Amino acid sequence: MKLLVLLVTLLVLSWTSAEDLGDQEILENNEDNNHESELGEPAAQHTDDETSQLGQALIPRCRKMPGVKMC
């Protein structure tokens, strides 16, 4: 039973860490685009899809897995 709990915990932690890394990449890309505009170059135009992805990265979201509730 303890082994099962340990395995589920590791699975959840690895899954959430992978998602957080993806969110961080979106934020870093946005910072790069802002830096370009500070240099006097035109800032990159964001598509609606990119803007919604950035908004998603900033809003905490519930993660649902069978038998596990995390918010």
UniProtKB/Swiss-Prot annotation:
Propeptide positions: 19-45
Swiss-Prot/TrEMBL keywords: Disulfide bond, Hydrolase, Secreted, Signal, Toxin
GO molecular function terms noted in the UniProt entry: hydrolase activity; toxin activity
Signal peptide range in chain numbering: 1-18
GO terms under cellular component: extracellular region
Catalytic class of the enzyme: hydrolase
Regulation: Inhibited by tissue-kallikrein inhibitor TKI and trasylol. Plasma kallikrein inhibitor PKSI527 and classical inhibitors of serine-, metallo-, thiol- or aspartate-peptidases evokes a minor inhibition of the peptide digestion.
Residues passing through the membrane, by range: none
Disulfide bonds: 62-71
Intracellular or extracellular location(s): Secreted
Principal cellular location given in the protein's record: secreted
Biased composition (Acidic residues): 22-31
Tissue distribution of the protein: Expressed by the venom gland.
Protein family according to the UniProt entry: Belongs to the natterin family.
Described purpose of this protein according to its UniProt entry: Shows nociceptive, edema-inducing and kininogenase activity with release of kallidin from low molecular weight kininogen. The cleavage occurs at Met-Lys bonds.
Name this protein carries in UniProt: Natterin-P
Organism: Thalassophryne nattereri
